[in-house]
């Protein structure tokens, strides 16, 4: 006779199952398990008197014959493609399978074979997401990387050379010398890294040199002169070498207006940074570019979400980052032209509509590198409060909204930069960059981070304690942070041309180097759950934003979740 167990006891033992709902941190967002790939009564769980023992849940199968290196049991997977309960197998640092783990000799429908060579990570009661991807990094200081990793980010793309004045303002690693040194520096960090060259040159040879040196993309920034001619020159090189172009457009409209930039882009694929405009771009109407099919629009996190403090903090940040002088009236006017309540409010709604597709940090250059995931889900929470459930959702759950927002920091930046074959989602064959969250700490503080199949970061107690849990408990680097494990668990993204020219070997790189690919044939329709193309207009006098004739506006929040409740210092 089968044993019956109530839902609450089952969830406490094996994690939530189909139909169970989970609250995300202290937000008003709730997810509901859509499907459970484990088998009731045949679940695997590790521990004394539990299932994963020799001859029971652990088989006699060797690693060579198919046993996985690591199994994650009973995890609640949250990804763009679904919110499901499953076991996850990892082998050779990659996701081997998502399904049912166990011993095929005594259990049915086993997709993931557990053997003596298999380690176990208990996923019960945890949300599992893909490692997040931040595509707007100013590499100002190396300490950013640990901060980002501790927040759940496992891939960082951007530019810079350290705290140089140019890097403080722009995400460019200019020239082959600096690109080479940054690629060599990347060897030291447990993070997937890639670097953008400076895209501002009408002489294509300057751009080609950087791509050949290993740049995985090119960045056009107004502080270096983003004119129609440099835009065209940069995109010509990108099309030839299959790298992405990121753009920060001309706030002052000196070389033309947003229409002139759209004309210069000429239908070619481009990733627009801080597309609302507070981070920079044609004032006041750069936001309308999100309606172009070839444009992959992103936000940076200082304007995420719109709160009562958003406008006040921006002016000083902007003056510092862009090397402006508060004694010069023109510099003050430049800064003030970028900070508009109306467009920031509209940005919230455009994200909720799926018209803005990506969220990144703008690290130490107005943005906060450790708050990308937090700010993303604060925005989702705000929009639920102010706009109610999406049409695809119900009063029971916010699954579609949550999948839309997780896509903005995982799969969509991966697609935009040609690395989605390797990272950006929990799918068979991809690198096992995975983040575990307690639901009460979701999007705030990860419980554990797996990098290339090995544990790289975890909440950990006193190392001198008799068990792992006594305080002080805080995030600490784990073994994949060190030595050759670091080298083999993390990756560097370069242009295909540079790999073909043996640049990794010439520079003495030990990390596995991966070529970006398919950056030029994509458009917004390829971005998951965030491909809406609204017809945007901006009133030049009031800065009010309209989508297909409808005013987009919302009020700022006085209080956000995932904030002081979690950060006491």
Swiss-Prot record:
Subcellular location as annotated: Cytoplasm
EC number of the protein: 3.5.1.5
Enzyme class: hydrolase
Manner of cofactor binding, per the entry note: Binds 2 nickel ions per subunit.
Chain sites annotated for binding Ni(2+) 2: 219, 248, 274
Domain of life where this protein originates: Bacteria
GO cellular component terms given for this protein: cytoplasm
Pfam families tied to this protein: Amidohydro_1 (PF01979), Urease_alpha (PF00449)
Residues modified to N6-carboxylysine: 219
Modification note: Carboxylation allows a single lysine to coordinate two nickel ions.
Domain (Urease) ranges: 131-569
Cofactor(s) listed: Ni cation
Binding site for Ni(2+) 1: 136, 138, 219, 362
CDD domains: Urease_alpha (cd00375)
Predominant cellular place of this UniProt entry's protein: cytoplasm
An example Gene Ontology biological process: urea catabolic process
GO molecular function term, any single one: urease activity
Key words of the record: Cytoplasm, Hydrolase, Metal-binding, Nickel
Family, similarity comment: Belongs to the metallo-dependent hydrolases superfamily. Urease alpha subunit family.
HAMAP family per UniProt: Urease_alpha (MF_01953)
Subunit structure: Heterotrimer of UreA (gamma), UreB (beta) and UreC (alpha) subunits. Three heterotrimers associate to form the active enzyme.
Protein name (record): Urease subunit alpha
Source organism: Prochlorococcus marinus (strain MIT 9312)
Gene for this chain: ureC
